[in-house]
Amino acid sequence: MEVIHGQPYCCRELEGADILSDTFYSNELHTPLETATRPTASEDRYQKFRQSLQRCRLPWGAEREYGGMIPISLPEEHRPKCEPPRVMGKGHQHYGFGGEIWPRKLPIEQFYYLSQNKKSDIYGNDSLLPKPPNSTVGEICSPYPIEHPYHTHISRGAMFPTFTSPKDLYTGIKARTQQPFPPTVPTKPYDTTVLKTRGNPYRYELLDFPMDSKKKALVWPGQRVYFDLPKCVEKNKPVFYPKPPKTFAPNTSLNSWDPITSLKEVNIQRNLEKSHWITSYNHDFTGLGPMNPLELDDYHEKEVAELTGQIGFDPEPQEKVHPALKPTRPLEGRIARLIQNQRPLEAILEQRPSSCPDCTPRVLCTFHTFVPSSTEMMALSDNIPADVTHKNQEIEEKIKEEQSLLSTYALPSCYPTKDLANTYDIKPFPKITDTKKTEDLYWRQLSLKPQLIPYCNPDHYIPYEHLNQYNVYQNPVSLSKPGILQSKPDLKTFDFEHFLSKPEQLTLNMEDDEETKPILGWIPRAGVAKPQTDLLELKNAFSKTGAQKRFHKSVLEDYKDLRDKEHLGKKHQFYGHNSYYFYN
């Protein structure tokens, strides 16, 4: 029984296997028309047919490689009548060729005129390399660029930005060329030479501590390319693990296309680096709001300091604009008229008509000059000493002065009052701009208390509920106890006999008693010092414990015991029984 061959795309060898697999015993039943038709046979029968067939076994893969079994290529004039058998095209070794190096029993014929290639006159064949006995091939030791084995895990750029300029006089390239180096330029570490023989258990290290004049500046390796040396016989060993390279080494270099070296740029970059040292707190809270943009160009000031001989002049960058608090411009008044280049207005007050035709506001007549006042007459009648009369007279003048200041802001005529201020006939509601207190009012020094509301006439009477004896100001929130003028039920009975009855006690209590303080509070240029707030006394008056006690007293609810367990979930007890019994 002859073996039927399959498709001819495989190598021309005897098909079949020594042991047929189980998938080929009944291939027509399981996989019909999918494989080549092949009758099955037993193993012994197959070996008999294989040995009976006499065929020349060729090298494996000869047809599928360069120079394998190909038909003989001959020109048309040399073409034989019958086609010659196939032979090996070329016999010299090629990589991937599965046959023998030098084929035997088959001649090697090469026809160079079939192509444009020309046969070499030096060698006997077309090989460019000489034969091994005549070749002189040697190793070439030349460095080649390499990368560190951990190059993929090394940052390609600088991790932290730098503000140093290559033109800097202290950290730039010019500073690296000077020796000894300034303290602002880092230097390389000391070189270490390790002397150790292979197999020797001891390690000998030689440390070289160079002098300051022989130190080298610190630079990053790998600025251009790393080169490695191959393993040669009589050469140095290669550097297996060089220092980690960086694709962009942060070494500074001067721009050759920019010959102008500007020292201002170096100064600006230095100040820019200093500006990053300012904390966010100092930047946002300066006392006058956030910080304004900084002035980074102070090269002129540093040049002047260098010429004048100042050593170490390197100030911190300052703000371009310093904020200042400017008061608002008044719309009217004395200051507004001065800003508008207008003549300031003078206060015009109506003088009280004199009862004596010979008296003037400044000069009195002869009669009133020598006639004693009512106070002096009362003092003579009561036999009061002269020194007490003098003190009472000073008190009377002081009260008159305060009442005269208060008379500038008199109430309308519908509220007639009986006090010393109504002795002068002044227009009601005078303008503040017509007085000489505009500047004091602008600087918030004229802190006037509102006028007291006196008793009105029966025609203007409005029925109100009876309230406690408090002085009602225009602001209903502020209440105070009655002052000196309201100590008696009727203002008509007010005279100086109350002051003259106890002169010593009145003199001592004028400064200490709160009721005898100036009516207008503090008046500028009135001879009274401005009252100061005692912050320490106010601070000591506060008690944290007392505040907590008042807070706890304000809470009306009962204190909760943290040990009590409050169940905020669903209710499980109904009428004293658990819900389990109701469901079952």
Swiss-Prot record:
Cellular location(s): Cytoplasm, Cytoskeleton, Microtubule organizing center, Centrosome; Cytoplasm, Cytoskeleton, Flagellum axoneme
Pfam families linked to this entry: SPMIP4-like
UniProtKB keywords: Cell projection, Cilium, Cytoplasm, Cytoskeleton, Flagellum
GO annotations of cellular component type: centrosome; cytoplasm; motile cilium
TM segment ranges: none
Task performed by this protein: Microtubule inner protein (MIP) part of the dynein-decorated doublet microtubules (DMTs) in flagellum axoneme. May serve to reinforce and thus stabilize the microtubule structure in the sperm flagella.
Protein name, UniProt field: Sperm-associated microtubule inner protein 4
Lineage, opening ranks: Eukaryota, Metazoa, Chordata, Craniata, Vertebrata
